Structures are given as C-alpha cells and as structure tokens.
Amino acid sequence: MAFLSDTLARVKPSQTIAVTNKARELAAAGRDVIGLGAGEPDFDTPDNIKAAAKRAIDAGRTKYTAVDGIPELKRAICEKFERENGLKYTPAQVTVGTGGKQILYNALVATLNPGDEVIIPAPYWVSYPDMVLLAGGTPVSVAAGMETGFKLTPEQLEAAITPRTKWFIFNSPSNPTGAAYTRAELAALCEVLMRHPQVWIMSDDMYEHLVFDDFDFTTPAQIEPGLYDRTLTCNGVSKAYCMTGWRIGYAAGPVELIRAMGTIQSQSTSNPCSIAQYAALEALSGPQEFLATNREAFQRRRDLVVSMLNEAKGVTCPNPEGAFYVYPDISGCIGKTSAGGAKITDDEAFASALLEETGVAVVFGAAFGLSPNFRISYATADEVLREACARIQAFCAGLS
C-alpha cells in the first residue's frame, strides 16, 4: 500500500515559491541574484497597523477567537465592502481565514464533488488549478492570450460552461498578468453568467487597490446585483496593506456557504492568528492615505519595467492595468541558444538560463498555464528593477 495519497500525485508544488526559494539558495551561496519571483510588496507594514498588533499583545488578546474571525473585524469588513464596493453584507455573511489562499480553498472544499468543473481563465495564479484538484473538482482552463489583453471574452466563457460547471474563478487585476477588466468587459461576462444559474462566481479581488492610470475597479456582485446570491467576493490585507506575512484573508457571500466554509476551517486550522486579526482591523479601519502613495510607486515601477523589457530583443511586454506583475511574451526568443550555450526550447528553459547566466530569477509562463511568457514581480526597488531589466536585455541580445 502506497504511503502518499493519490490526491498528492495530481498536484504540484507552487512554482512561484520554488523560484523564490531557488533564488534565496543561490544568494546564500554567494551568487549575485535578483529575485523577481515573489508576489510580495517590498514596503513595510504601516506603523499604525504594527502598533495595533502590539496593543493587542499587551492587552492579552492572545487566546482562541471565533473560528472565522473576531466580530470587530467582521464588522469592519462589512463597512469596507459598503464603503468601497457598494455591497451590503452582515457579519454572518463574512468569514476570515489564514490568508486569501485558505479562503478560496475552504470554499472549494465545502462545495466541490467529483466531476464538478471550475472554469479558470489562463494565465492564472498557480494555485487555482491545484486547489480545485485537492478539493476533488476538475479545473477547466480557458486561454485568454495577449490578443485579448489576457482577458476572457464572453464567447469563451459561454463556450466553457457545461452542466457540470459549479464555479467560475474571476481575478481582476490578475496575477500573473496585471490585466484588469473594465466595467463594460465585466458586465459582458456577468450577462453570460446570468444565463447559467448553476454557476457560482468566486471573485478574487486581492489586488483591488493596485490599479493604475485612474482605472475604475469593479467586482461582479457590484456590477450585476442578480449575481449577489451566488458570488463569493474574496479579498485580504496582504498586498495592498503590505501584510503578506500576517496571513489574513476574508470573503463575503451567502450565509449557507459562509457557514460551510467555517465548518471546514473549524476542523483544519481553526481561527486565524488573534494578533493578526487586530492588525487587520486597524488596516481596514485606520488611515488609508498610504494606499495612494504605494500605488504611485508601483505605477512608476510598472512604467520602468514595461519600457525596458520592450527594448529587449524578442520580447513583447503589454502594459498592465494593475497588480505588480508584468507577463511579457518571449516568442521571439524560442528556438535560440543563449551565450552560455543553453537551448531556449520553451519559457522554462528561458527562465532557467536567465537565472544561471545573469542571476535574475523570474517565473516561467507554463506555471501559469500560458506560454511562451515569464512573470516578473516589480514589487521591489527601482534601482533593482533597472539592473534586472538591463541584465534581461543583455541576455536576450546574446541569443543566437
């Protein structure tokens, strides 16, 4: 009898984590490495949020909490949804988990049966398909390439829906492309979904506050009230509030679903960290001005990276609307040989040779379901990005 489960054989480790770990190992060994794999802001958690956590510790708020979040945080989340998205929820419709990833996973485990399908536009966050597999469902990837701005069309969505479809995962702005759907584009998708009442919508809004050029962020339940009762609107404090290590995600949706997710959490991790919950409460309720300051920095970095990558031979880099990623196409590099003798057969070979020969760590596109591309996280200092892009330019210039 095999010791490891059949389920494990169907999933793979996160490639973004693998690339980040590889870069750290090389740096620890003395290599000059620039890691652009991690989707993590380089800015520190704001002082008022850290102070709230310290107050919670001093006040002895170090015990178990309610499984799916303290009441104060749930109320703050309700206020956030109404203030920023025009969505009204009660605390009973809100759940808090140990990061956005747990929120999504809880929902999938609570709802999927064998044979249930989940539509996932590609390129996608690396964890979506594997979480569906772990939950017993079937991921259905639909390619949304550069020709559509990395956005799913209504026609593609309609064609992908079957009687077995249970969820549609929607992520805007997107990881890995930074693409964000306009109000009109989202409305067109919602029109399709209104024709299929068996399909639920999982909206991953983690990058909501990271949109550029005065882009108007919208979310499905906000655009189409008719979808409110079958939409799980997911968010968290990791990206916008520079709190990736605090591990707090949250979602709002129908009470029956929220209760089911709470049951899953009660038998897995139980409550999120009590101190982190009080920090998240301050994040959502405290001063918000720094969001605009950070957004300006990310927009400046985006402009720098897009400009420099488009000067690299064989590379085409679209200009994303949000998040802190770019997803350049490297069709012009495939089939060539690097200065170090590496055959660039695909985007994984490109990323491997780039790391080995220049010390720049990126994530290859196949990990996100669409090739030939690679992802760069530009959530790091301008001078680091400038050096990394210069190395990429030199690497591409050396291909023959």
From Swiss-Prot:
Keyword field contains Glycoprotein: no
Keyword Nucleotide-binding applies: no
GO cellular component: cytoplasm
One annotated GO molecular function: L-aspartate:2-oxoglutarate aminotransferase activity
Superkingdom of origin organism: Bacteria
Pfam families reported for this sequence: Aminotran_1_2
Modified residue annotations for N6-(pyridoxal phosphate)lysine: K239
Main location: cytoplasm
Subunit structure comment from the entry: Homodimer.
Name assigned to this protein: Aspartate/prephenate aminotransferase
